[in-house]
Amino acid sequence: MELKEVKFDCRFFKGEIPCLPNKLRNKVCNTCDEHDPIKTRILIIKLGALGDVIRTTPLVSRYRKIYPNLHITWITQSPDILPKDHIEKILPFDFKSVFLVTHQSFDIAINLDKDQEACQLLADVDAKQKFGFTWKDQHIAAATPAAEHKLITGFFDNISKENKKN
């Protein structure tokens, strides 16, 4: 086995530790029949409340249906509650994890929190597409027009009470 034969694009590749097919079945890249090349990398930023993190986990199965060969990285303050068998990389919200995600590239990055640190993190992440809430001109901003309504209803109680959208 040579380094040039390592399949770095495989969903099972962990980098610093042996992959699951190697651990369980002694597979090595150059002869592995379980190679699962990553086509899409998604970062989910959901730092906040425990209940909110739990309520957003159905996104994982939805994205898996939309994007075959998906690799999900999720950064949160509650890493222990996320389904480890459905998310490739679960990171605690700390300096090391922020450093890691801001030095990688993603196809899609989604920030579901309106907290400043989450918004600034999305702004700093390298992603082809960004959704949710970001940071621009020293304040929270919508990453796409679809997030604008949610921001407005969050800014003003009276508009939120009149809200007919979800």
Predicted regions mapped to residue ranges:
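Catalytic machinery of carbohydrate-active enzymes
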Residues: 1-166
